[in-house]
Amino acid sequence: MGGSSKTVRKLEVATPVPADIDIANAVEPLHIADIAADLNLSPRHYDLYGKYKAKVLLSVLDEVQETQDGYYVVVGGITPTPLGEGKSTTTVGLCQALGAFLDKKVVTCLRQPSQGPTFGIKGGAAGGGYSQVIPMDEFNLHLTGDIHAITASNNLLAAAIDTRMFHESTQSDKALFNRLCPPNKEGKRTFCNIMHRRLKKLGIDKTNPDDLTPEEVTKFARLDIDPDSITWRRVMDVNDRFLRKISVGQGPDEKGMVRETGFDISVASEIMAVLALTTSLADMRERLGKMVIGNSKAGEPITADDLGLGGALTVLMKDAINPTLMQTLEGTPVLVHAGPFANIAHGNSSIVADKIALKLVGPGGFVVTEAGFGSDIGTEKFMNIKCRYSGLTPQCAIVVATVRALKMHGGGPQVVAGKPLDRAYLTENVGLVEAGCVNLARHIINTKAYGSNVVVAINMFSSDTEAELNAVKKAAMDAGAFDAVICTHHAHGGKGAVDLGIAVQKACENVTQPLRFLYPLDISIKEKIEAIAKSYGAAGVEYSEQAEKKIEMYSKQGFSNLPICMAKTQYSFSHNAAEKGAPSGFILPIRDVRGSIGAGFIYPLVGTMSTMPGLPTRPCFFDIDLDTTTGKVIGLS
């Protein structure tokens, strides 16, 4: 089928490139029904959220099941500077090129940004320049309420944990059981549906509460949660460093049930990772129920279903499972869905959005999705976690590179967010670029190992010179890239990524290998960790005493067959953010090991990970305001 001829908008680009919000505000978005119609979606396939957003219903998949999938493209990058190298911008620019200039059916699949960093240091995540998702204020704030649903679900579970411990501390086994299974007016007791899951887990094959022995009553009614083992924390979608460590239960009515806990940012919740990795409503119900919140004092894992909550959480999340349809500046469709952390989770948008998109574009169409952080983290997790659960295979993997980042990897001065760039980054230095290309080469070699064709997108800045750009192209081709293309989509929109679009099309059409995972699932947790560490260039792995204990615990509990999601710095292949280039021969330290059992992965912590960001001295919110005459948002970046 042809391209998005009905909805394509040609941009009038200005030089120098105006602020992102000014570009976004200058373009009148199309009604989302027009974008939907171009994907052959009829009104029964989606729910409108205002004029520019719609939730695409999962039921669409039933109708398009027989359609052949389009091409699947993942966008990763080299090890970034703190300024970012433009993965989101490249993802959007490429899709604008494919849809608006190369007449292809295309859908962009992106993560939903967290509101916290939008007001903090990072700003928004809608792309930039003339490659953006619009309306950008709606994209960056609230969207269709998915993160609010995650916050509500997460905190309901947190409340249930503390309350259950409180009630168990003040009641006998018999009193607990009587309240959990109260008799009806006829004096008859029954188990509600979710209780049958707990009975099955305990190996109690009885359907009548009155048939339970006193021992079975105790086992069923008393979860006996070990407070020191609780891993579930409360969340909110605000950067608030003062909530990182708090104590709860200080009130006079809580009978001294005080414990230390803390808040994470909402997108760090396991429920967000569940949303991203789920394949259907039924699958989401199972994953939410399997989430482990801690252990009993006997060392047994306690789940959301044990607390009686799996069904209620699914009800709170039932609309959040539907991806949100939006558009780019040039009128090509975007599915925004899920935004898990890229360190303690896998940092990719949802499986269901990708599956819907691949059917909607059909054979010869393109679905382009972005993987958070550099390819060592984002693309690795995309392949070994996301593709393992989805069963999908990408034909092409893009590695976004900038001259700026390569100069840093070649030994250039430190790049610090919020500080002016050193002169080395603004003047020609081919030697510095060439030295830094060891980083690019390792990303290409690692990504190629999965079986996809690798295309390097060189995101060009105005200070880059021809000699520097040519050095990057040569290094990319020498390392085994399928192609390496210079792009100017930030300054020119889709027009600036046409060559990239052509290269990606050729790469997809010429893929010859199946997807190869880095490790099988049936080896030990340690063997999987070591396989990933080897891809970083590590000579070995060192485990803390805590990590050893946790690996033993998760293996004993039956979770050793899960994939591994490494939580490490994005600023180096190694655990040390200051080590640039392509370090090797180092020992990777594993400080702790945790599990997102419902989402379906074990995550080792390499170093310290903050799951609740703070605000800088001058947060982005200083610049954000509303034009009260037009109702337009100003200053959002």
UniProtKB/Swiss-Prot annotation:
CDD domains: FTHFS (cd00477). One of its GO terms (biological process) is tetrahydrofolate interconversion. Pathway: One-carbon metabolism; tetrahydrofolate interconversion. Its EC number is 6.3.4.3. InterPro entries: Formate_THF_ligase, Formate_THF_ligase_CS, P-loop_NTPase. It catalyses: (6S)-5,6,7,8-tetrahydrofolate + formate + ATP = (6R)-10-formyltetrahydrofolate + ADP + phosphate. SUPFAM superfamilies: P-loop containing nucleoside triphosphate hydrolases. Keywords: ATP-binding, Ligase, Nucleotide-binding, One-carbon metabolism. The keyword Transmembrane helix does not apply. The keyword Glycoprotein does not apply. ATP binds at T81, P82, L83, G84, E85, G86, K87, S88. GO terms for molecular function: ATP binding; formate-tetrahydrofolate ligase activity. It comes from the Eukaryota. HAMAP family: FTHFS. Belongs to the formate--tetrahydrofolate ligase family. Homodimer. This is Formate--tetrahydrofolate ligase. It comes from Spinacia oleracea (Spinach).
